[in-house]
Curated annotation (Swiss-Prot):
The gene is FAM106A. Belongs to the FAM106 family. This is Protein FAM106A. It comes from the Eukaryota. The lineage of its organism: Eukaryota, Metazoa, Chordata, Craniata, Vertebrata. It comes from Homo sapiens (Human).
Amino acid sequence: MLPSTMFLVHLPLSTNRLHCLRNTSLESYLCSFVHLNHPLHISDRVILISLHEAVRFSFAFSFPRGTLSIAYCLMSSVSTSSEAIMSTELLANYCHSSLHVCICISSFPNETGNHDSFPGAVVSISDQPTDQCKLAAKELPLRNLLECRFFDCMGEEDLINLGVIGTER
């Protein structure tokens, strides 16, 4: 992948599956993800965002040496709207600087009924308008990897809403 590409991954898990992530080795899942799909340098950063109070992560994760330095996690204190988190200055700074991979976990759509939690257009991998089929095909391996890594937590209804976006910076 080109270094100028930032990948945005949204995992809109069903509420009854959110608890699965509390006891999984998310660090190993994330490391496998960045190794196979978006090689990172030691100084690159990943931000993990949970929009549901039921999912609580440590602020900093420990990754194998040589993978990446640190992963950041922002928590939503109230599960009402994703826009409240996305508009924070902290996230905006990461999106325009050193952020390369962004993973969002939530269990609710926004006001429009879509999972467009981040700036830009989140592309649905399973249900594409004609003009977006090319991007969907390009990111299909990423969708397949996420399906494999989160198999125990994700169902068909989750995968239908799985969104990935690649934005040139």
